[in-house]
Each structure stands twice: as structure tokens, then as C-alpha cells.
Amino acid sequence: MGSVDTSVPSFDRAWSIKYEDLDFISEIGSGGFGKVFKGEYLGAPVAIKKIHILPDDPNRVDLEKFLNREIETIKLFTHPNVIQFVGISENNGILFIVTELIEGGDLQYYLKNQSIDLPWFLRANIALDVSLAMSYLHSKSIVHRDLKSTNLLVDKNWKIKVCDFGFARIVEEDNNKSMTICGTDNWMSPEMITGLDYDERSDIFSFGIVLLEIISRVKPAPYMRDASFGLAEDIVRNQLIPTDCPESLIDLTFNCCSVDPNNRPSFKEISQTLKQIKTTLDSNIVYPEIRDFEQQQKISTTNGNNKQNGGAPKINNLPLQYSNNNNNIYDDDDDDDDDDDDNDSFPRPYSDNSNSNVTLESNSNYNSSTINGQEQQEQQEQQQQQQVKEERDEGEIEQDDDNIEVYDSDYQKKLEEHQKELLERQNQNQEGSTDENEVYEQEEEEEEEDEEEQVISTPAKKRISFGQDTFHTYEAYRTDDEDDDDDEEDEEEGDEYDHGYDDFDEDDEDDEEYDEDEDDEDERQIQYYQQQLQYQQQLQKQQEQEYQRQQQLQLQREEEEYQRQLQQQQQQQQQQQQQQQQHQQQYDDDDDDDDEEEEEYDDVIRHDTDSEEESKDKTPLPWDQHFEKQKESENKVEQEETNVVVANSQETEQQQQQQQQPKEEEEEEPTKVEDVKVETEEQTKEEHDVKVDEESTKVDEPVDEPTKVEESVEQVKAEEPNKVEELVEEVKVEEEPTNVEEVKAEEPVEEVKVEEPVEEVKAEEPVEEVKAEEPVEEVKTEEPVEEVKVEEPVEEVKVEEPVEEVEAEESVQEPVEEVKVDEPTKVEEPTKVEEPIEEVKVEEPTKVEESIEEVKVEEPTKVEEPVEEIKPEEPTKVEESVEDVKVEDVKVEEVKAEEPTKAEESVEDVKVEEPIKVEEPVKVEEPVKVEEPVKVEEPIKVEEPIKVEEPIKVEEPIKVEEPIKVEEPVKVEVASPVVQEQPPQQEEKPEVVSTSTITIASSPQQSSNSPPSTPVKQPQQQEIEVNSTPIKQQQQQQQTPTQQTQTPTKQHTEINVQPTPTKTPPLPPQTNEKIPLISPNNKSNRGCCSCFIQ
């Protein structure tokens, strides 16, 4: 037979803790021996259990024994599901057990709180943690003997910790069944209740009751048991277990609660079963929140007064908690019902059992002799009662208002119950003690009779009766009738318990005093609760008033904000209306202006389109008829232009005249020469060369295309610079010189000016040199200028369909063969002078090519042959070829001798028939030499503008030149660059001249695209006369060289470069003499057109 070691362990150094190292923070619960505090040990959070036993306590021996077991047992545990022991501390005879802190509280709180959702997976996991902890304890031969939900703590991760090992004891194999009755009745096994021997399997039955509590979330009660103290299956299955509970959990519960211990599974088997059950449940759950400790207050342990006075420091300002929630984390008893007060896990009252031999060390204050006698016991009881009263009074007096809890309707119910109990007690006290004594004597007699009938095996066993009259849940409160029944049962059980274990009787006087004290205490509690209710009601009223006031203020703010927003919106609307009115006014004004401009523009376009349609529909007429029609068209154009342009051009003319006065004085001589022919071709060539040099220098700086500028000059000369200049001046009045693309078709003059070379070189200066301004005034409305503008097909490339087919590169490579001279004739068609175009064959470019060949290489003869094959159909192609020729001229001088012929053809198309007067292009060649485009591949740079070849797009401004209608020179596409007298002197010069004339013929926008030659003010003052002659005459002129220049015989026009236009009769086509242009004043005296010479 083994024995159980019940001696209190000595305070080892490993487990002893200095009291000064402990810091008390707040009270978190109470237990069988005292209170539990939250504190810190050397900065680590811990739970501190205060054990306070009076030296005169009659239950001192059992209490010491209970404490000794818990300390000895808990020291042995190291398991994640068992609470960890930290150490023991002593101060003035009071022990403090220090363990790890579990802040979640006991499991019973979560089970009885129905508002907390506990999924089945979580419930199974809780049961598994408990089974693992108990399996560990049983492996150490330890029986817990008090397993219940209040001894299961929940940490922050929902890990379960088993605690409260006061009843645990180590069981030896030899004597593992003879143990005393202990634990809590509702979780107690049948063998323990009946007083039979039991072992660790008793914990398995208690675990089954805990599992039933987890499943049903109902507190265990006697009605759940049957006659054999097992589970009543019908009641449990039909009333307690939810319908969605897994059947495996139900089966496991009944197996654990089997009446026969041999049929109960071990905790190892239970753990395996629970693991399998978890696999069948949904693990995707949300864990409930863990409750926090209630109000906490730091308590200083370094205060010397506390140590001197002795005992643990008293905690002040702790709230007096009275609610339906049990916040005692380490609570060893269940205080919810009165029937648990005497049956919870607390050491049994003192008995005369001699086996209690527990003693403390000699240095401990617990060492005392046994106390005998009724008087000493009474004194001890009185001392305990006084101490309890003092603690309660201090807790009530020092109650802090800030820590008052808010009580709900449950609190009011509880208050009413206390009031009823108080009244009942008072009534009972008034009846007198005589009745009570009689009742007490009768009860004793009945109990003695019962004892005689029953055979008691051991004096330590007690009788327990289970009643199934009440049904308890955590949320429901007990009724008055139930409380009365419970009180009666408690009294009966208490009597039986006392007769079984105690041999002493309490005096009636002490009972009366104790009852009076309790009554006073209850009255104080009731008063206190009433005060708290009143205080809370006042607070609620104040809160409601404050809320109403805030609501009113909020409404006022919203109204003010709404009004402010309305005002802002109104202001914005007013501003928008004002802005709309202003915009409407401006829009109306702009519409009026636009309408006027559109009317003017429509008039011009209408006239142009009419004239163009007529030119297309009609077949070529004889020269006389054509001349008469030309006069009529000129008169019409003059009238229209004067009405549209003169009004706007007066102011600009005045400004330009003021600026050009000094220049005109310098250039008076060329103005005088206007009516005089060129004295000699050599002189004109020299003058032209000098002027071209100036232009080239000027053009080189602002524009990379001096050659184009020269071509534009030659083209303007070929088109009778007098008319061109006049148109330029008129257009200046309307708009300042800008890019030809920007100029509208209404203002062709502007487009002519806008040519980039004109802007950069200041086309005004060349106008001054040529002083064509006066003739401009005379020839303001010349049809050829307008026709140049009218060349809408050039812009759209509709007129010149072959333009699309022929690419610029092809024209460059084989300008003569690919580019047909007929193209410029087509260009003349949009310019309204299609007849001369048809009559005039583009043999002039052939001659130009010959001249180029003579100047550079004799290959131009070859070029003439493709010229003969060329048919003048598409001036646009010629223009493209001109642009291409420019590029090639810049690149190769010798091979591009033919290219300048194309360039000349393009010049003819562009109305730049200046090359007819070979002298000027020859002169132009000199500035080209200055630029050294031939020698130095600078003209290659010029090629970039040629590549730009935007002038094709610029043909739009050519359309703008419709009022000018300078198509006459366009019609007579003179190979002006070809007719150059200097090619024999400088063979390379004419080539350069051709290239230069091509570049100068128009800005990078007009060089190729404007076959009707846009008028541009150029430094050269020579005039260009376009002589329309039959193709045969032009061929003859080409065949007869004049001063090493090939005059175009086949060409329809001859360009006589003269400083100023002079009134002279037309010269024969084969003569080398220059024919001056006829001024508009002498048109009526002539029998031929001002542009063509017989």
C-alpha cells in the first residue's frame, strides 16, 4: 500500500520570489482561498493568487493540505495546455502563488454568453485541448478530481489551459482508489458521488460533462442525471443537444459519461477521436474576440506603510461588480446559484480526522497548536465575520464613481429579488426564534432516523440527492419560488453534511447576530444600487439633452450651408449669363465680318470658276478672237479687283510708299526705263546679274533656297512684273506677307508676296528696284494674275491628273522624256488661257535644255528631242519636275543640264517665263555662283527646301491669285532659264541659272506647284513679257540664237527682261531684241494682248 505525500514543500530558491519584485495591477477574480490579481513579476505579466488563512481558522489544517497539494502538483507541469507555475512569495504570513497570466478568462463565460458564436470546429478544438492536457496529467499519475468549465482558461489564441489543481493528487499504483470525496457535484462521477473507490477514470466522466456543456452551452444540473447518476439520454438528446451537432460528438459524450468506468475511453483515445472529428468540419471560421480584463489600476508594492502594517496591500477604488456576468477568472466556485455555495470546489469544513498531519516549517506563521473548546471557535468565527464586513465596507466607501458599471434590465431584476429576500428574512426574524428551534429539532430527529436506516461504510462519505424540478441556464434568472426551494434543499443538505462531518453545534445567538449583520449589509447594497440607478438615469437624461442640442445645432448649420450654396449658385448663374451675352455680341460681330468676307470671296471664286469652266468647254480660238476675249476678261477682272482690293490696299500702299521712297529715289533710272526697251542684251544681263547677286545674298541668309527666290523673280518678270507688282501691293493692303499656304485664294497678291523668299529677302526691295509698283497700279486686275490664283486644280492636282502619275524623282531623272511639255499647257487651262497653252508646245523647255547644254554640256540637244515628244498637258507635272530638277541641279551640274530644262518648263508652267530673257537668268546664275551651288554642293542644302516642295500645296495661294489672273505668262510657258545669253560665256552658269531660277521662281511652296508664276518683288527691275506666239514661231525663235541664247521659236511666249516695261510694238519671234510689256494704258491702242506678241 502506497501513501500520498501531503507535506508542504519548502520554499526552494528556485521557486521563491521576493515580494518586492511583484507589482499588483488589478483584481481579476476570487477563489476558494482569497483573491486573484493581475500583476507583473520583474516586468513579465503574471497572475498572483493571494492565500490568506487566519491562524485561528478551524479549517486551517484542511486548507493547508489543499494549498500544499496545489503547489506541489503545479510545480511538475510543463505542457502547453496546462497553466505554468512561476513561483511562491510570502509576506507577513500571507502566501502568494504566481502563475502565468491567461487574459481570456474561463471557458464558462463564453459558453453561457449566447451572443458569442462558437463554430463546431472551434468547439471540437476546445475539447481536443482539454483532452491533451488531461492525457498529459494522467501520464504523470495525477488525478485532477475537479475538472469543470470554470477551471479551463482561454488565452488570446483560443488555446485552452487547465488550472486549479487544489484537489489534484498523485496516485500510486498500490493505492489508487481510496481517496476522499472532492470536486463539484454537477461534474462529479457516479462512483465519487456514491462514495465508491475511484481513480483517474473519474476525470473522464467529468470531461464528458464538460463536453456536454460545450455542445449544449447549458450549465450542468441534477435534472440531467438519471437514477444511476449517469446522463439521462432522453432529456439530453431531446432538450439539450442542437440539431446541427455532429453525431460523433454526441456519441463521444455518452461514451465518456458511461456509468461503468470500464466502458469509458482513455484520454488518448478521446484525443484521436476528436482529431478525426475535426477533419470532417469546416475549418474556415472566424474566431470570436477574447474579452479583456476590466478596469486595471497600478498598485505600488514599494510603499513602506503597507509592509509595516503587514499583509498584502489592499486594493482601493475597485468597482463593486454586480452583474449577471461572472468575471472571476480564477474562480474556484460557482456563485450563480445558491445550491453551489456549499458544494463547489472548496476544502470540506473542518473534521476530527486524525490523518491530517500537515504542518508548516518552524519559521512559518502557520505553525500553531490545535485549538480546543467552543469559545475559541466562536471567537474565530466572529473575527472572520468582522474581517469580511471591513473588506466590504472599504470596497463600498472607496468605490470610485468613475468605475461605476452600467446596469441593464437584468440588474433591476436582481435588485428586486434581493429586496424580496430581505423582506422575507425580516418577517422570519419577527416570528421569533422559538419556531426556528422547533423546526431545527424536528429536522435533527428526522436525520437521525435516516442515518439509522442507512449503512454508512466510511464516515467521510456524504449523501447527495438530485432533484429534477428546475432547469438552469446561464442567461435565465431564478424565480422566487425556485430560490425558496433551493434554500430548503440547501438547509437539508447542509444539515446532513454537518451531521456527517461535524460534531459541534452553532449557538442560536451567533446565528441571529450573523443574520442581522447580513440584513444590514443587504440594505446597504440595495441603497447603493438605488443610488447608482438614479445616477445613471441622470446621466442618460443629460446625454439625451446634449444629443438634442447637437441635433439642433447641426440642423442650423445645414440650413446656413444650404443658403450659402444657393447664393453661390445664383451668383454663378448671373455671371454665366453675362458671359454668354458678351460672347453672343462678339459672335454676332464676328459673323457680320465673316459674312462680308465670304461674300467677297464668293464673288471672286464664282468669277474664277466661271472663267475656268468657259476655258475648259471652249476649244482654242484664233488669235484675234482670243485677244478680244482676253480684253473683255481683263476689264471684268479690273472692275472686280478694284472694288474688292483697292479699298483695303490704299492704307498699306501709303505705308509702303513711305518706306520705299528712299529706295525709289535710288532706283529712278530703272523706273524711267519702263517705257524704253533694253539698250543691249549685254547691259541688261550685267544689271540682272548684279541684282541677282544681291538677291541671292539676301535670300541665302533667311532662306536656304536662293535659287527658288531667283526663279520666282524670273517668273514674276516673265509674267510682266508691272502687273505682278501691282497685285502684290494690293494684296499687301489686305494682309502682310506670310506663307503662301496661309494666304487665302481671295488675295493672290499676298500669296505672291508671302513666298518665303519674298519675306526673307523683303520682296518689297525687288519691287522697288524693278519699280513695278506703278505698273502694278496700272495692271492691278490683269486676268493672268487671277488665273494664276484660279489654278485650284494645281492645288487639288485635279487639273493636272498626270501630276499624280508622274513622280518628282522620275522627272528629275528623265525630265524631258517623262515630263511632257503638254503639262504646262494644262496648267494654262486652269489659268483660263488654255488656248495659248495648246498652241504653245513646250518646245521652250527643249530650247532651255539646249541652252543649258550649251552652257554646261551639249547634251541639251538630246533634251530637245524628248521635249519634242513632250506634250503640254499637265503643268502640275512640270512643276513637280521643276522641284525635282532643283534637287538634281544642286546635286549634279553636268547631268542636270537637262533638269534645268525641266525647271524651265516648270518655270513656264509657273508663269516664270523669265528664262525667255536669257540675260536675266544668266545674271541670276552669278548669284548662284556666289552661292556656289554647282561647285560647292551648297545647293544641295537648297535641295532641302526643294525636298520640302510644299509649294505644291502652295498652289492654293496660286488660286488666291485668281484676281491677278497672270495665266498669260503661264499659258506661254517660256523656257526662260533656257534663253540665256551667257551660257556661251559661262557654260556652267546657265545650268546654275536654271537651277537658281527654279528655286527663285517661287518660294519653296510655289517653285514647282505654281506654274502660273506667282508675282514676287525681286531686286531685278527688268520686266518679263510673255509673248504668245504659235508653236512654229517659238521653234523658230529657239533655232535663232541671240547672244549665245536660244530664243524659243516653238514657245508661245518670249520673256524680255527689261528694267522697266516700255510701250513698244511686239518684236518678231526670231529677233534677239527684247520686247517690253505693254502698259495697261496702251492696251486699247493695241490690236493684240498685252501678254502675247505676234
Swiss-Prot record:
Ranges where the record places region 40 X 9 AA approximate repeats of V-K-V-E-E-P-V-E-E: 676-978
Binding-site positions, ATP: I28, G29, S30, G31, G32, F33, G34, K35, V36, K49
Annotated Pfam families: PK_Tyr_Ser-Thr (PF07714)
Keywords: ATP-binding, Kinase, Nucleotide-binding, Repeat, Serine/threonine-protein kinase, Transferase
EC number: 2.7.11.1
Entry's Gene Ontology BP terms: signal transduction
InterPro entries, A to Z: Actin_reg-Ser/Thr_kinase (IPR050940), Kinase-like_dom_sf (IPR011009), Prot_kinase_dom (IPR000719), Protein_kinase_ATP_BS (IPR017441), Ser-Thr/Tyr_kinase_cat_dom (IPR001245), Ser/Thr_kinase_AS (IPR008271)
Reactions accelerated catalytically: L-seryl-[protein] + ATP = O-phospho-L-seryl-[protein] + ADP + H(+); L-threonyl-[protein] + ATP = O-phospho-L-threonyl-[protein] + ADP + H(+)
Residue ranges of the region described as Disordered: 301-884, 946-1083
Domain Protein kinase positions: 22-281
A GO term from the CC aspect: cytoplasm
PROSITE patterns reported for this sequence: PROTEIN_KINASE_ATP, PROTEIN_KINASE_DOM, PROTEIN_KINASE_ST
Active site per the UniProt annotation: D146 (proton acceptor)
Domain of life: Eukaryota
Composition bias, Basic and acidic residues: 410-424, 603-639, 670-801, 817-884, 946-971
Feature: compositional bias, Polar residues: 351-373, 1016-1031
Bias-annotated ranges (Acidic residues): 330-344, 393-408, 433-454, 480-496, 503-523, 587-602, 802-816
Family statement drawn from the similarity comment of this UniProt entry: Belongs to the protein kinase superfamily. TKL Ser/Thr protein kinase family.
Protein name in UniProt: Probable serine/threonine-protein kinase kinX
Gene transcribed to yield this protein: kinX
